[in-house]
Structures are given as structure tokens and as C-alpha cells.
Amino acid sequence: MWKLKIAEGSPGLDTLNDHVGRQIWCYEKDAGTPEEHAEVEEARAKFTEQRHEQRQSADILMKLQLLKENSFSPLPTQPKVDRFEDITEDAVQTTLRRALRFFAAIQAHDGHWPGDHAGLMFLTPCLVICLYVTGALNTVLSEAHRQEMRRYLYNHQNKDGGWGLNIESHSTMFCTVFSYVTLRLLEEGPHDGDEGAMESARLWILDHGGAIAIPSWGKFWLAVLGVFEWSGVHPMPPEIWFLPHFLPIHPGQMNIHGKLILLPMTYIYGRQFVGPITSLVKALRGEIFSTHYNTIDWQEARTMCAKEDRYYSTPFVQDLAFTFAKQCTEPLLRSWPGSLVRKKALERVIKWIHTEDKNFRYVGIGPLSKVSVMLCCWIEDPNSEAFKRHLLRVHDYLWLAEDGMKMQGYNGCQMWETVLGTQAVLSARMHDECNSMLRKAEDYISKTQIQEDGNLDTKLWYHKISKGGWPHSTRDHGWPISDCSAEGLKVALALADLPWAMTGSQISEENLFDCVNVILSLQNPDGGFSAFELKRAYPWAEKLLQSETFGDITIDYSWVECSSSCIQALVAFKKKYTTHRKEEICRAINRACRFIESIQRKDGSWYGYWAVCFTYGAWFGITGLVAAGKSFHESEAIRRACDFLLSKQLPSGGWGESYLSSENEEYTHLKHGRAHVVHTAWSLLALLASGQAERDPVPLHRAATILINSQLENGDYPQQEIVGAIHKTCMTTYTLFCNIFAIQALGEYRQKIFHS
């Protein structure tokens, strides 16, 4: 039986805080009672049966374990509201109490709330390909792991036989080829799978032009595996790191994720690495192409991309640059004396890789970077200590649910969901009942704050300050993010206002000042705040490096969400520490406020980049402006945003937004006009912050009715459509958002409606 292990290490792992936040799924053959096994199998069978209607898993395996460990207590009787006019404070309070008890019961012993953070279908295949070519697949992944990965891939196959970019999207060549290849590497035969699953996948591939039409990132990984030729891959010369730093096209000017994904890819490309050509690799060459492998025109294949995968058109200048590099510079760099330049470039890249690894404990900033860097270490030396240390961190990225095992978008979202969850608990204003929960959460938040800048030459390696910030997941991950830092600061200040005996030790003033320093360092000249680092390049550089599949991969722009979080944190800080960097903080708030107003769309909405989508953007846009001192009556931006939200409210009283809003940049309702708990909660929070209760509370009552009636018998909330997003087309899972935001919205509703 599978067990989730929290805050446990293993020999060879470096850590800064005793592995606090680390979450690892381990298979224990003899663990569990027959009843527990039956519960797990029932959850798996139910998901598989309903997989085409309900794509999101509900983290049932994790919840079964934690509810038992934390001795989940009986709940008050569940209230139901027939009409919004019948809402009483008692109904709201009872719903909150039930939700809080459930939420407390799924908190880990180190204070964070674990949860699924996957959703992207191309991550697990990259890991499996890397482990296969390095010969580590069966060493790192037991048969139990491999079986759960097979379960995951089959569960998320579309009815047409293909796989989408995320668990809800239409089938794409990228993820259909990747999933098919991965299943073959996981020892599935070409005719295996229920109802001919493998055959239907292969048929989808061939009917849509074959793997020759996979987008560029797919071509790269297939070349690594040996089922694509490097001559059919866009050039990624490591020499680009020798360009003058001031050039906008220098990759050091890219956003941190793009930079640290491209870095190892240039090394792998420069080495033209190909894994062992096994009988399975040879078989795949004959299975996924519509013509014989040896007759493929690889030069022509280099620019091909299936229409299902082409979210964005690549500009002519990019095609011209790639063609020039392929035909002119690459031949020079592969032969003497140009090969000496390549040798130096490869040495520089691998040195940078080792520097990053040592400073960030071999966790990696994200899954694609992690896997690519791990492969680089093996290419340099298969027996290296670096590669061995990377293998020890693979399981940090794996998550298990009733739909199977998958690779997550980070090594988790522990810090993010913990600070959001803590704010939700505080919003309920039932502190006496949440004492233990708040103590544990503060302990996690305190131990996760970054306390050092690392041993890095910030200019040479394109780094910024880290000390005082908070990461998305764990301290060992170590990358500070503006909104995680801002929300962490907000929570630290809010907890400090509670009685000392309730939460125990508090975060020091010096650490709070360090956090403010990190936040202020991330404000761009346009007044907005980036996520990881300042915006360095120009928008035209984005076009030059455009991917067919992903949006905004080059520049870390200013975002409405990050800007709003930073405004709210700085305002809260300024109220308590009135003299610390006073003028600088006031200027930062005013500039960020103007930025939020400047990027509002004509219809009154804001595009939410980090979640789906316009409801998320509206919540941050409104709350940021309100925190800065704006009001509905004096701010046209707030009025327009409220009008926008109210225009999208469904007849049921809720809101429900499709992930297509993120892809198409246009508000799209869920199918059949369904309401979504999370979108309803975000919209309710935004309207409450704007003062809607004083103007017309009816829309609020209707939304609150949805949240009350959606609660499940055990105090949980249902998993619905996917809510996380990045790069416009990449949707990610946050299974705890339904709990967190339902609690926060009902807590604020209760306060504004019954206690104002």
C-alpha cells in the first residue's frame, strides 16, 4: 500500500531545514488493512469509470491517510439552503466549522497542506525518457511506481485515442506521441491497454501525420531517445551563452524558467547526445512515423508541426535564424577549429549547471529543468556524484492520486497553498477552534523562509537576491517568488496580531524587513511586479523565441496577481512598521496601483496569468486597488471590474470559467453553464472587497448559496475543472483550492453581511 511520507530525508540529501515540506510517496507491500485496500481500489475504479467526465483527481489516497492519522472528528449536521433568501449566519457558520475541521484533518504534521500539483501531460514522459536513456528507469522507479504511471497515462487518454497538453485539453501530437512512447518504455506492448488503447493511440498519431509533426520540444526529447534525428531539431548552440550580456537576445535576459530549461538543452544539443539504440527504440521508429524512418527528410521535418499543436505561429525571422544556424554556423562549430569554441561553450554551460545544482540542493527550479540537468550530469559522467544526487530528488516531483502517479509542475506547491490556506483560516475568525492548525502553519511558514542568498556571482549567473523571500514549495527548492513572498509576509503580519500564546514563536522583524527588500527588488520600471525576476528583454524578443505550443516563455512580465499581492503585503507592512523605508514603499504601492489600472482590459477584466483566468485576475485586480486605498465610488477601474464580474454570474448564482479562457484570452463559461466552487469563491471575494454588500447584496447571497450547498458530507468540497495556469496553454492542478477559497469566501461573507 502507498504511504505519503512527510519531512523525511535519506542519505546523501542536503537540506537547510530538516526536509520540512518534503513529500514522498512510498510503496509498502505489507501495509494497510483489507478495508483500506478496498477503499483505495474503489476510488481508483470510480475515477477510471468517470474519467471522461471528471478529469481531476480528488487526492483521495492522501485524504484517506491523513484523515485517519489526524483522527478526523464527527461534524455538525450539514446545512442546505433552498433559496438564497433563507441564508442565516448559523448556516454559514456551520458550513465554515465543517470545512475547517476537514481542512485541519488533512494538514501534515510539519504544518503544510499536501496536494496534487500536476496536470501537464508532457512532464512524466520527459522523466521516463531521461531515466531510460541513462539506464536508471527500473532502479529509480519500482514496478509499483511504473504501474501507477501506466494507470495515470491510460486514465487521461482522450476518447479519440490521443492525449492533450493538459488533462482536459484536446489531443495533440506532442502529448500523444510522448504518452505512447512512455507507455512503451514502461513495458506496455503495441497492442496493450483496455479496448485497444495503444492501437488507438498509434492510429491517432499516424492519422495526424506521424511523429514527424511533433512540435520542437518533442523533437528534442525524441532525438535524445533515438527516435528522431538531430538534423531534424532546431539548433540550440551552447555558444549563445557567449553573446554579449547586454544584447536583448542573450538567453540570460530570459525569464528564469526559460533560461534554466534552455541551459541544459544547449548542452545536450551541443553534445548531440543519443541514448542507446535498443530493440525497443528501433521498434518505436517503425511505430510512430507514417513513412519508413530511413526515408524521412529530416531537414523538412525540422519545421513541421501538427495543426493541433500550433497554438502560436513562429515568425519568419525565427525560421530564418534557425536555418542560418543549421546550415552555416553548426558545420563550422562541429569541425576544427570551431570545435574548440564548442568545447569551451560546453564547459561553461556544465559549470553553470553544477553551480545551480550545488546552490539549490539538486532539486531544480522545475520539472523540465530538473530532468534536463540530470541528463547533462549523466552525459558528462555517468558515475558522477552530481547524477547520483539528482536521482535522490526525483521522487520529490512525483505525486500519487486515485488516477495514478504523475510528475508535478514543481516539487509541490506547499508554501503557496499553506499561506493561502492560513489566510482562509484567519478569514473564518474562529481562532479558538483553529489554534493547533495556525500554530503548525506558522511553524511551516517560518521554517520555509529563505535565509541566505547562496554562493553565487549574481551578475555572472543572472541571479538576484533571495534572502527573506518565500518559494512556491520548500526552502530546499530555494527560489523566491514575488507573490509567494508577499502572501507569506501578509500571513506573518496577520499571525503576529494574534495572541502570542496562540501561535507561539513569531517571525523576526529582521526577517520581515528582508522580505520587504526582496519584494521591492522585483518591481519593474512599468510599476508592476514580476514573479521571479525583473523584466529584462523586449517584447520583440518574445516573438523571436516563440514556441509553437507555449506563450510568454521568454520574458517575466509584470502580472496583475503579483502586483496585487505585493501591494497588499506592503500596505499591511506599512501599517505596522510606519517608518521602515516609508517613502520607497509608498512610491512602490502607488506605481503598482497605476500599473494595475493601466492593464485593465476594455471590458473591465484583467487577464489572470497564473490561474484560470478572468475571475482570478478580477479578484487580484480589485483587492489590490482596494488595499491601495481605492474605492468603488472613486475608482472607475473597480466599478468596471465589478460590472464585468456581475455580467458573468450564472443563473445558478455561481461562476464557472473554462481553461479555454486562458488559451483564447477571452472569457469562456464552463460547458452547460456549470458553476465552479473556486471561480465562485474568487468572484465573491472580489465583490465583497469592492463593497458590494452595501450596494446590492443579492449577488453575494446567490454565490454564498452555491458554496454552502456544494459542500460534501465530510466537509470537503468537490474537485471540478482545472484551475491553475501558466504560459497560457499549460494548466495545472491545485486540489486544495476548492477548500481554501470556499472557506475564505464564506468567512469574508459572514463578516461583511452579518457583522458590518
From Swiss-Prot:
According to its UniProt record, which residues of this chain constitute the active site?
A: D483 (proton donor)
The alphabetized UniProt keywords are:
Isomerase, Repeat
Q: Which CDD domains match?
A: SQCY_1
Indicate yes or no for the key word Isomerase.
yes
Give the pathway annotation: Secondary metabolite biosynthesis; terpenoid biosynthesis
Enzyme Commission number, as recorded: 5.4.99.65
Tell me which domain of life the UniProt entry assigns to the organism this sequence originates from: Eukaryota
Please list the coiled coil stretches.
none
PFTB repeats: from-to residues = 96-138, 146-187, 438-491, 512-554, 589-629, 638-679, 700-747
Give one Pfam family, short name only: SQHop_cyclase_C
UniProt-annotated site: Transition state stabilizer, residues: W416, W610
> What Gene Ontology cellular-component terms does the record carry?
lipid droplet
Q: Which Gene3D superfamilies match?
A: 1.50.10.20
Family to which this protein belongs = Belongs to the terpene cyclase/mutase family.
Q: What does this protein do?
A: Oxidosqualene cyclase involved in the biosynthesis of alpha-onocerin, a triterpenoid characterized by a symmetrical structure due to cyclizations at both termini of dioxidosqualene that inhibits acetylcholinesterase. Catalyzes the first half of the cyclization, exclusively from dioxidosqualene.
This chain belongs to the protein called Pre-alpha-onocerin synthase LCC
Q: From which lineage does this chain's organism come?
A: Eukaryota, Viridiplantae, Streptophyta, Embryophyta, Tracheophyta
Supply the gene name.
Answer: LCC
